[in-house]
Amino acid sequence: MKKIRKGDRVVILSGNDKGRSGEVIKVNPGESKALVRGINMVKRHQRQTQKQEAGIISKEAPIHLSNLAIADPKDGKPTRVGFRMNADGGKVRFAKRSGELIDG
């Protein structure tokens, strides 16, 4: 089970966007990287296609998972993730900082 998943709210721990938070759009476990909405924006030169105009566009660049931490559901501060078994025998994630469940 992965600690960071698509849709999670994360806090950036290092880099230009340190301290900012955003939602995970995509996780690439093979490269240990994730895309976070509105974070680590880079400019790309776009070639013209039938659907898009040419020009310079801003898009998210991947961030290494070691530079991300789950935001605590209680107060939004960075927390580590733990796993515990629920009553049904399924594995659920919880915030070690507050004990709150991350999986609804």
Curated annotation (Swiss-Prot):
<dbReference type="GO" id="GO:1990904">
    <property type="term" value="C:ribonucleoprotein complex"/>
</dbReference>
<dbReference type="GO" id="GO:0006412">
    <property type="term" value="P:translation"/>
</dbReference>
<dbReference type="GO" id="GO:0005840">
    <property type="term" value="C:ribosome"/>
</dbReference>
<keyword id="KW-0699">rRNA-binding</keyword>
<dbReference type="GO" id="GO:0003735">
    <property type="term" value="F:structural constituent of ribosome"/>
</dbReference>
<dbReference type="Pfam" id="PF00467">
    <property type="entry name" value="KOW"/>
</dbReference>
<dbReference type="InterPro" id="IPR014722">
    <property type="entry name" value="Rib_uL2_dom2"/>
</dbReference>
<dbReference type="InterPro" id="IPR005824">
    <property type="entry name" value="KOW"/>
</dbReference>
<dbReference type="InterPro" id="IPR008991">
    <property type="entry name" value="Translation_prot_SH3-like_sf"/>
</dbReference>
<keyword id="KW-0689">Ribosomal protein</keyword>
<dbReference type="Pfam" id="PF17136">
    <property type="entry name" value="ribosomal_L24"/>
</dbReference>
<keyword id="KW-0687">Ribonucleoprotein</keyword>
<keyword id="KW-0694">RNA-binding</keyword>
<protein>
    <recommendedName>
        <fullName>Large ribosomal subunit protein uL24</fullName>
    </recommendedName>
</protein>
<dbReference type="InterPro" id="IPR041988">
    <property type="entry name" value="Ribosomal_uL24_KOW"/>
</dbReference>
<comment type="function">
    <text>One of the proteins that surrounds the polypeptide exit tunnel on the outside of the subunit.</text>
</comment>
<dbReference type="InterPro" id="IPR005825">
    <property type="entry name" value="Ribosomal_uL24_CS"/>
</dbReference>
<dbReference type="GO" id="GO:0019843">
    <property type="term" value="F:rRNA binding"/>
</dbReference>
<comment type="subunit">
    <text>Part of the 50S ribosomal subunit.</text>
</comment>
<comment type="similarity">
    <text>Belongs to the universal ribosomal protein uL24 family.</text>
</comment>
<dbReference type="InterPro" id="IPR003256">
    <property type="entry name" value="Ribosomal_uL24"/>
</dbReference>
<comment type="function">
    <text>One of two assembly initiator proteins, it binds directly to the 5'-end of the 23S rRNA, where it nucleates assembly of the 50S subunit.</text>
</comment>
